[in-house]
Structures are given as C-alpha cells and as structure tokens.
Amino acid sequence: MFKSFDGLKLSNSELEGRYIIANRDIDIGESILKCKSYFAVTCEDFKKNSCYNCIKLIKSPSPQQVPRCFGCNEVWYCSEKCKQDNQAKHQHYECAFFNNIKSPKLIQNSKLDFDSYSEIRIILGLLSRYYQDKLLNNKFNSSIIINNQQDDEEDFIKDTLDGVLDLVENDINEETNSVAKEYIDNIIEYIINILKLTINNNSNDNNNNNNNNNNNNNNNNNNNNNNNNNNNNNIEELIKLIRPLIQKVRCNQFGIWTKNDKCIGMAVSPSSSYFNHSCIPNCESVRDGSDMTFKSLFPIKKGDQINISYLALDKSTKRRRDYLKFGYYFHCQCPRCNSTDIDPTGKLEDSLDNWISKFYCHQKKCTGLYYSKLKLSLQSLTNIDNHEIQLSCSTCNDQLIVNSNFYLNKPNY
C-alpha cells in the first residue's frame, strides 16, 4: 500500500484498530509519507476567498476577478486553471447537490448553524462520487482528480473511494454523545432533503425532455416509471451511507490551515488516517493546501508506533482528553495522558511535557510544531556545530535554530 515508503508497516489491534509502525529506524526529518487528499472542501466562512481545487487562499485583488462555478455558486477558484482542473469531479452531481444546499425550501425550516454547511458539503461531495462511481457506473479519472501532476504522482499515495468507505468510525449515539447525535440527526435530515430535491428534479427534467422528443406515450410512461424506481432505489442507498460517512469523516478528517493558523478547509485522506493520535507525537503533518507530507520530529525506532497529534498540545491532560472525547469520541491513553497513573510523583509527566514542549512553535497563537526539513541521523548530530540545525514550524513556517543537544535526553515511555 505504501509504495516506496519502505519504513512503514500497517498493523492492527482490537484496542487501537489500524495503525502504522516503523519497519526500520527512522531518522529526524524524514518524509515518512506523502498524501494527496481524496476529497477536500473549503470551510463555509472562507469559501469565497479560498480555492476549492488547491484549498489555498485566493490572492486576487477583487471578488469580480475570482473564477467560480456559476452552476452552484458554492465554490470559488484561484485561477482558471484550477477551475478547469476541478471540473472533472465537480461538474456532475456534486455541483447539482451543492446548488440545493441553500435552497429556500430547506433553509426556512433548518435547525443548522453556519458552520454546519462545511460538513454538509464534504458529505455531499463524497456521496456524489459514490453516486456517480458506484450507482451510475461512471468512473472518475484518477489522473484528472490529482490535477494532472504526473511529475510527482509517484511520490504520493493514491487514495480511493473504497478507502474512504473502509475508514474506521466511532458510533455516535445517545450514550456516547447525545449532543453530537442530535446535531448529526439534523444534518442527516438536511442532506436527505437535498438528495431527494436534486435527483428527483433532474429526473423530472429528463422525463420532460423525453416526452417532448417522443410521441409514444406508453413507452414514455414506462420509461418514466423505471427512471423513478431507479431514482428511489439510488436515493435509499445514498441515505444508508450518510450516517456512516459522517461518523467516518468526523473521526478521520484533517483541517487545512493557513500560516496565520486559520482553518480554511477540511480534507479526507484514508492513508493519512492510519496515523493514530498521541499527545507526545513523533511525527507531524506539513500541509500544502490539500497535500500533506508527514515528517518525523525525532528519531523513531523500528517497531515503534508512528503517531501524530489531533489537537493543540499545550493544554492540560484534562483539557486534551475532553477535546478528544468530544471531537473524536475516544479517551486518550497515550503515555503523556497516562503518565500520572504510571508515576504518581509527577516526574514522568514533567519530563514528557518538557520534551514535547521544545517542539512547540514560539509564535503567539500558533499551534504548529518545529521539524527539520533535512534528514538528520543521530550519528551526524555529533558532527554538527552549535546553531547549525534549522527547524521550521509546520504551520506558520517560523524558523528556529537549535544545536545538537536539542534532540538528546529523550525520556523513555
């Protein structure tokens, strides 16, 4: 699965599900994995000034110069090239579904808040691909989806729709999270109405066109009935997918952040989702729009699990666990969160806090981590003079100069 990424091995356990372990010793600053998001959307409050294709801020001086989709009026682009590259996946049912997101028929009775529309768009986008790929048997061209970047295609993992459908999900119900369940129920109802409105309207348009072009009423009626039955069956199959997709996406999505630490988009990348969380991660995701590169923060031994963090790390154990429980529906049992259980004196907790805090970005309000852009081995560190190791923040790209002692005295856990 991981192609040329020879240092990775996919493992599985009943407690942790699927996760990635190091298949060899991994050095500082290694590019562990490169992924192109299978699907990404801009956030609702940034959709007019962020490109829907590359998920980067638009630098155009005026809104009138920003290309957009006039079919749905829900997506904007940084250039005509990005708009053209995106048409292969957007011009079919995704555009039609998006066009009805703000339908007056739906909004007037809606219980949703502003931010809900970002989640609705990512679910509708995935449903549109399933509808086109699985139900209509109109396959996507994967080479088009990755924007025709043939030069670096081999460096990136290719994710698929089947990979999304195979993602692990956490059941969100009255017992696990009653507030989230009610919220999701409202989103599901809204999406169902969009599906029915879109598919039935498109079917009615097609039926009317057929009737106008053919005088055989009996044949037309039979064809119309068959189309209606097929549409109802397709809608029912799509409806069955909505809740599982929401639960999969909520547990596995990645935020796409600007250098100012603003979340402008959300992405789903199945291969990236194999990285489990730890509050003392040994790996960090470096994002470039909807693309991600995972870099090792410090040396990783063969057999160690490779982890990333799902949250800002400069919080107390309680706040971190509460955030993960509410947002990702699990109780964190990482070494840092469990440190007080292992060592009631607090010494282990202090040593782990001190170790990982060295990697926190120094810029105010930035939640990124410092990593080395260059691959460095522990052996080579002894030959590096003071102030020769340059680190970069994964979010804001702030630079930090450290010496070889920065990587020494890593606590055992």
UniProtKB/Swiss-Prot annotation:
One of its GO terms (molecular function) is zinc ion binding. Residues 205-232 are annotated as: Disordered. Residues 6-311 form the SET domain. Its EC number is 2.1.1.-. Keywords: Coiled coil, Metal-binding, Methyltransferase, S-adenosyl-L-methionine, Transferase, Zinc, Zinc-finger. One of its GO terms (cellular component) is nucleus. Residues 216-243 form a coiled coil. One of its GO terms (biological process) is methylation. A zinc finger (MYND-type) spans 51-95. Belongs to the class V-like SAM-binding methyltransferase superfamily. Probable methyltransferase. This is SET and MYND domain-containing protein DDB_G0273591. It comes from Dictyostelium discoideum (Social amoeba).
